[in-house]
Amino acid sequence: RDRMNKIRLVVASLLLGAATGFAQKPFNASGTGNPIIPGYFADPTVKKFGDTYYMYATTDGSGAGFGPAQVWTSKDFVNWTLMPMNWPDSHWIWAPDVMKHTDGNYYYFYCQPCMIHCGVSETPRGPWKNILGESEAVLVPDRFVTNAITLDGQTFVDDDGSVYLYWGTWGIYKGFGCGAGKLASDMKSFTETRLIPNTEATDFFEAPFVMKRKGIYYFMYSSGSCHDHTYRVQYATSDKPMGPYTYRGCILETNTDGTIHGPGHHSVLKEGNEYYMVYHRHDNPHSNRGFHRQLCVDRMEFAEDGSIKSLIPTHDGIGALASSVVKSKNLALGAKVRASSFYDAGFRPEYAVDDNNGTLWLSLIHI
């Protein structure tokens, strides 16, 4: 009997290890699917317009979202091309989002502390012009909704075509929360606004994202500190887009070995009947205070009652969502590499040719 109990314990441990990602590739393995793209980016919104995926994100650049306006495009969700955008022509472009309206136009929302701007275009990559006329005109000023600090604007389009905008950061204080508004048909004003308080969205910090599935509205958001391992994704549900909402729990957090560190500020891509969460995590090895972030994606799953199952963040990602557009072979993969120096063991020369967007080589002296 003792021997059988030991066998059951071993089998259970193996199953648990598989379920929690115990057997996954390490973060620095060759050919990982996460991060999705090379470089340091954050706050991703991924949309599919026609047969093309568009990924809009904060560009960390030298750190903490300093970069300009740009967009990544892909036909297969594996091979991406970086494209600049004309507007705005400044830096510090945070948490961008683009949506297609029933009027056929595309609307581009981006943030600068602490305000939200909106541009309009006939294509999802511009050229953009401010919907209010002047280039720096502000759609949502700070505290437009009382006790909602204006940042991280994100749109949701309901089944009837109604457009909602959600925003907020530092919503942890008593009486604070997330701003929400129903946009007028001209997209220049609001017909209804509300504060979604942190009593409904427990520990709401920032980065709201709303989606609808089978009649349930899911209000997802990030909690904790964006600088450390406490950053995570939680959610609440309602039968109305503006709430009131009921808190449901945490669905994405730092993994057990810390190599997926501080995952959060996400969006959701729906592809057929499948849902994918696209989010950022801190770089590996972790830099100071999480100012260099990387974009990842993992599959979402739902229980029979509509609740979101806890995501198991991976280094594998999801792979291609369409036939690959790149037919040529990666000739550099696995090649022997030498360098005059390297910074430390976390930045070895072979990382330059390992087909892993999360690793890189740095010389001992680098800028």
Where are these regions (language model features)?
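Bacterial N-terminal signal peptides that target proteins for export
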Residues: 2-11
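Bacterial N-terminal signal peptides
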Residues: 10-18
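Beta-rich carbohydrate-recognition and catalytic domains
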Residues: 24-202, 212-258, 273-275, 280-325
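Aromatic-lined glycan-binding groove of carbohydrate-active enzymes
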Residues: 209
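Signature of short aromatic-glycine-proline-rich micro-motifs recurring in repeat-based ectodomains
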Residues: 264-267
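Disordered, acidic Ser/Thr/Pro-rich linker "stalks" and the adjacent N-terminal cap
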Residues: 319-365
